[in-house]
From Swiss-Prot:
InterPro entries with a match to the protein in the record: Helicase/UvrB_N, Helicase_ATP-bd, Helicase_Restrict-Modif_Enz, P-loop_NTPase
Pfam families assigned: ResIII (PF04851)
PROSITE patterns: DEAH_ATP_HELICASE, HELICASE_ATP_BIND_1
Domain called Helicase ATP-binding: residue spans: 110-262
Family: Belongs to the DEAD box helicase family. DEAH subfamily.
Organism lineage: Viruses, Varidnaviria, Bamfordvirae, Nucleocytoviricota, Pokkesviricetes
Xref: SUPFAM superfamilies: P-loop containing nucleoside triphosphate hydrolases
Descriptive protein name: Putative ATP-dependent RNA helicase QP509L
Catalytic activity, EC: 3.6.4.13
Chain location of the short sequence motif DEAH box per the record: 215-218
Induction or repression: Expressed in the late phase of the viral replicative cycle.
Length: 513
């Protein structure tokens, strides 16, 4: 059977393949289809999403090149589109790598030496995925396209590439660069582009790149972003992710058909000390009742209602003030130090402005940065992004902040709204490799005791326990929006003193009055 290999993958005549496989044809397509899991509280009228690891173009059905071994039993005769790649300048440059990074570089390099090589790197947040990828660029010496989700990450890549490989011509490809038609790999050695721009480019744009690096590869599951895979099949592809299979709906599994199973390295033991300050907040009755949609609690609407409580907003401001003025004299037996900076996480973008206004009244001489606000207004400037590296307080949404954004001087987090998913990535914002390990990491976690979302704290406890962070509990209310009476409820050095658990209490064991 004949097949072609092109940018779209392995192309086989649809009718011939169907005739060859007969009943197995339907089974093949089903195996290459990922169906989203229904989420708790999801309205019934919302269609269940499906994505396929095949695409139809005219008389041909295309599959990821990664699957070509599965077709060997059909004695395929491949006709591959010829690709001519220039070599990048070979200049001996050295930059330090940790042992685990060097081991992974060697493993990836071996895999990507073969034509159409694929590698999906799974490495925890803050452990140097970018540096590993840059080392691969240096070894392969192919024109490289780096695809990133946001401009903030694009700027970080440009900075790292310029620092570590100064002999290469590096450029950022964005909306402004789109107007420059000759901006290709012929003019530059490495181009770093944002997915929202690159996904619109025709397949000819990707032809000169011998290597494509997909940063935050797990995020390419969305219907629009996923289309990029059908344009880069001829290149070697390196996917990077800290959470490759972490989506509640399971849609990130579609990436595996293109990159293979995520490969994880042995990560170093975390050396950051820290603790959690868990505040049990009793909100005003007008704001704590659940919001239901189709007879099910809506987490989004419930959080929105919680943040209408002005006392809860003031509680976050008070905690920011406390962290900002924190000194080594605070009597915790693990010791504390004045934090370099504070990240305040919220669930929705509209809350950024609310908290910014509240914080600005208290911190008149303190630099507060909200990078997403500039993004929403039409693009964040490089100057604004550079300011985040010196800001005392940064406001972010969980969705924006969980990506691979690097703030090495940040050591404290305030979770202004409840959170269940992506907690390891969130904590990774203050535990990045290369940041000051002497600084104690502090997490302020607000538990809304009267809200149905309060049970999410048990999911967060599991992550805190994994990190080895002691948990101190205190209380606050809408009548008293500042925390007090701090009590140690979990000690990693003396687990027998547990006053909290990592699982919710069983309903059958609870006393009813």
């Amino acid at each position: 059977m004949e097949a072609i290999i092109s940018f779209a993958g392995i192309g086989i005549n649809y009718k011939r393949l169907q005739s060859k496989l007969q009943h197995d044809f339907g089974r093949l397509l089903k195996a290459l289809t990922v169906t989203a899991r229904a989420l708790p509280g999801q309205p019934k009228h919302i269609a269940i999403r499906q994505e396929t690891a095949f695409t139809l173009q005219g008389e041909y059905i295309y599959f990821p090149i990664l699957l070509r071994k599965q077709f060997e039993m059909f004695n395929m005769v491949y006709t591959a589109r010829p690709v001519s790649l220039r070599a990048l300048p070979c200049v001996e440059t050295e930059f330090p790598l940790f042992n685990y990074q060097q081991e992974m570089v060697d493993k990836i390099h071996k895999k990507l030496l073969s034509p159409y090589g694929r590698f999906y790197l799974h490495l925890n947040t803050g452990l140097g995925k970018t540096r590993i990828a840059i080392s691969i660029i240096q070894k392969l010496l192919y024109p490289t396209l780096v695809i990133v989700p946001t401009k903030a990450i694009q700027v970080q890549w440009i900075d790292e590439l310029t620092l570590l490989l100064p002999h290469l011509r590096v450029a950022a490809y964005n909306n402004a660069a789109c107007k420059k038609k000759d901006m290709t790999s012929k003019e530059y050695d490495v181009i770093v582009g944002i997915i929202n721009t690159l996904r619109k480019k025709p397949e000819q744009f990707f032809e000169p790149f011998g290597l494509v690096v997909l940063d935050e590869a797990h995020e390419l599951h969305s219907p629009e972003n996923y289309k990029i895979f059908w344009k880069i099949q001829l290149s070697r592809i390196l996917g990077l992710s800290a959470t490759p299979l972490d989506r509640p709906d399971g849609m990130d599994k579609i990436i595996i058909h293109h990159l293979g199973q995520p490969q994880r390295t042995v990560s170093p033991t975390t050396t950051f000390s820290g603790y959690v300050r868990e505040i049990e907040y009793q909100g005003h009755p007008d704001f704590v009742s659940p919001v239901c949609i189709n007879e099910k609690v809506s987490a989004i609407a419930t959080i929105d209602k919680l943040l209408q409580d002005p006392s809860r907003i003031q509680l976050v401001v008070n905690e920011a003030k406390r962290l900002y003025s924190l000194h080594t004299a605070e009597p915790h037996k693990w010791g504390t130090d004045e934090p370099y900076g504070i990240i305040i996480f919220v669930e929705f973008r509209k809350l950024l402005e609310i908290f910014y206004q509240a914080l600005s009244k208290e911190f008149k001489d303190v630099q507060i940065i909200v990078p997403e606000v500039a993004l929403l207004c039409g693009g964040v400037s490089n100057t604004a992004l550079s300011q985040t590296h010196s800001a005392s307080i940064i406001l972010l949404t969980y969705g924006y902040g969980r990506r691979g954004i690097s703030f090495k001087h940040m050591t404290s987090i305030i979770m202004a709204t409840p959170r269940r998913n992506n907690m390891e990535q969130i904590l990774g914002r203050i535990t990045r490799q290369g940041s000051d390990e002497k600084k104690v990491r502090i997490v302020v976690d607000i538990k809304d005791t009267l809200s149905p979302l309060s049970s999410q704290v048990y999911d967060r406890h599991r992550i805190y326990k994994k990190k080895g962070y002691p948990i101190f509990k205190c209380s606050a209310s809408y009548q008293q929006p500042y925390s007090s009476n701090e009590v140690l409820i979990w000690d990693p050095y003396n687990e027998s003193c547990l006053a909290c658990t990592t699982t919710p209490p069983s309903p059958s064991k609870q006393k009813h009055t």
